[in-house]
Amino acid sequence: MNMVQAINLALRQEMERDESVLILGEDVGKDGGVFRVTDGLLDAFGPERVIDTPLAESGIVGSAVGMAIAGLRPVCEMQFDGFSYLMIPQLEGNASRYRARTRSQRTVPMVVRIPYGGGVRALEHHSEARETFYAFPGVKVVVPSGPRNARSLMASAIRDPDPVVFLEPKRSYRAFKEEVPESADDLPIGKAQVVRQGTDLTVVSWGAMMRPVIQAVEDVASARSVTIELIDLLTLAPMDAEAVASSVRKTGRLVVVQESPRSFGVASEVIAQVNDRSFLYLEAPVKRVTGYDVVTPYFGRENLYIPGVERIRNGIEETLDF
């Protein structure tokens, strides 16, 4: 099952389980979404629970906030990452604040699905990775890296009592398949996953970058006879900082890989958390392998912008050699 199918399965199962779950967004009904993630759900659940909306991102999320306050569990879809910025006033100004405003008497259980990132030969405002834009206090930010954890994290996001931004790496949608069990794994929001155990170096990444990172880690580990610990964050906010810090206390070295621009990104927060918790254990400067501080380029230059296996491998080797 690929990631599109896995997310579709999670949506279908959660809608069957809980009648308060509904879907709204641009073309999510009749067309099944721009990437067909909601394909077949209109036929299964009808137009009252799978709602096609106008092209108005702020209106979609604002409506979802009202639905959630009224007792529903809406899942909204933004067609592309670059269009999602229009809904930020609703996400930050209303959804993120409602628990605090009511002193936790009321919450806003809603999910905002956002296809994000490059690698699909699209325009720059269809290909951006700006994860930190959504990490307001009161909002949880989740990024799956494969079909199996996408299905489980979507179930956790829908059941969560607070607003969740569910970032879906577009180039992972149909890039590979995994066996997805009938029942979702117990994969709580806020918990990172150690993909590979090691003692010589820690590598941290998330989302679509996990595929080239795994390849680079395997290449270096094989060539150098070292063991490298690999952590998939899965949740960016709240970050499982202790999982990273405890790994660094064991390995003494850290490389963080992200697709987004170098400055003001999730990698910077990972490094700050490690400095707070494990600085005295570091045996080398922490390395960032990232995109560049430029507007996301057109698809003809994406291969230069998005970190590939070679750049990641070089970053790992430089850190090991320090």
Regions found by a protein language model. Give the residues of each.
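Thiamine diphosphate
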Residues: 1-163, 167, 170-322
